[in-house]
Amino acid sequence: MTTTIQLASSRQWIGLCLFVALTPPLLAQALSATNPLDRVESSQVDDAVRTVMQRNNVPAVSLAIVRHAQIAYLKAYGAAELSTDIGHIHPTRSSRAASVSTRFAIGSISKEFTAAAILVLADRGQLSLDDTVSKYLPQLTGASRITIRELLNHTSGYLDYFLQEYIPARMQRPTSVDAILKAWAQRPLAFLPGEDWQYSGTNYVIAGRIVEKITGEPYEKFLEDNVLRPIGITDETFADHPSQPERNAVGYYRFALGPPRLAPLTGRNWLFAMADLEMTARDVALWDVSVINQSLLCSACYQAMSSEAKTSNGGPTGYGLGFFVRQIAGTDGKQHLMLHHPGEISGFRSHNFVLPDLKAAVVILTNAEYSDTTSELAEQLQSVVGIKPAEQSGADTAVSFIPSAVEENAIEARAHRLMLHLAQGLVDRADLAPDASETFTREAINDIRKSLAPLGDLERVKLDSTQLRGGTKHYALTLIYHRRKLQIAEYDLADGKIEQFLIDDKP
């Protein structure tokens, strides 16, 4: 019997369609009994993780590799929690080891699960992806013109409420979902629905609220009962309602190249439905296996999830429903679909890659918000899952703009001036918006100054790329020293004030 689901409009039906510590308490832990990687492959994976962790000063990595639609490799490295002397990254006997049962905050990988929750409801005929938001939340801007599909693929036009790559002091205090929607989803749109693409967490807060409106249940309960439990995930927790916190990794960040510092916690409800899950690498891998096997949803649902959305004029977005989508070259000489999503939240970075037709996946979870360990590891591990090593993992689709030569020179000159002053322990607060100014504490300034001192003189600042997001202009800049390069992620508000000025190592 063929089943049908209403994924489109009421008139259109679609057929069913991964630095091992030297001390014994912190030896890397693995489930070797279920590890079919051969000795050479396992050694290559271990060497890659160990090298990248040591180079980037990352406390812990948890890694899962899926091959043949089965978890083929599951291993954790390093310290889930550092000793109280956090000025020293090398784990000591008082550090808590990471294990394969350690949970990490997965950040925006959570969006994959929110998209799945919506698709469960679509599969059951309880909503259509082309229902307008007004059916559930009529008070929101553009609600009668924006569809649920446009929420999930980021073509709605709603501004991103959580665009900073740090947690402002105001977001360390509790909020409510309704307050987020009132403040951010009742503003003018960034563009007309469907006409452009901008990544926005606001879309997924709205989607999570729609789940609650339809089901009459808290979003978390519906997700557990209808997405997680059916595919064997029983060990997750949520940032707002943590269980067994002693099993969770502690997150760390740093200022420039300074020592790891305890990352602040995000206030209650700020992560709702868009970045709130905390999971083991195994749990994320179980989700990936379900995507590969299409075991939770109907085939039309997976087709919708994995199909790249287009703007109204046919432009690319690089995004499906809850996943970035791209084609990537395999070691077999063919092109293969890759679904992936990065996650970054206070103290954590992660990345999930799924290759459905290769029946493979890679999950990389870390408790360091600094450095790009996940991307570095992904590039080194691609051959293990049948992808050409030279192939890059792919950057997020971004709406870019081209500054004039005068603007480009001004951006580079200001960043150069700010860096010169920071190297002297000074901050030009007149250039900073309140959120950014609050991040430059005395501890932060000292860490930056001390870590920059060994680099010598700053020779040049170079603007690499630009992006528009959440009503801000994003600038990626390279800092060129004699023997090293750093990078800046700068976000500017409409008034020209700097909302973010983060300094990190450059891969």
Regions of interest found by a model, annotated:
Residues 351-367, 486-489, 498-504:
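Short, well-ordered beta-strand elements
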Residues 79-81, 86, 144-346:
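Short, surface-exposed loop or secondary-structure junction motifs
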Residues 45-49, 63, 69, 104-130, ...:
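Active-site SXXK
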Residues 13-25:
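Bacterial N-terminal signal peptides
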Residues 467-507:
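Exposed beta-sheet edge and beta->alpha loop/turn motif
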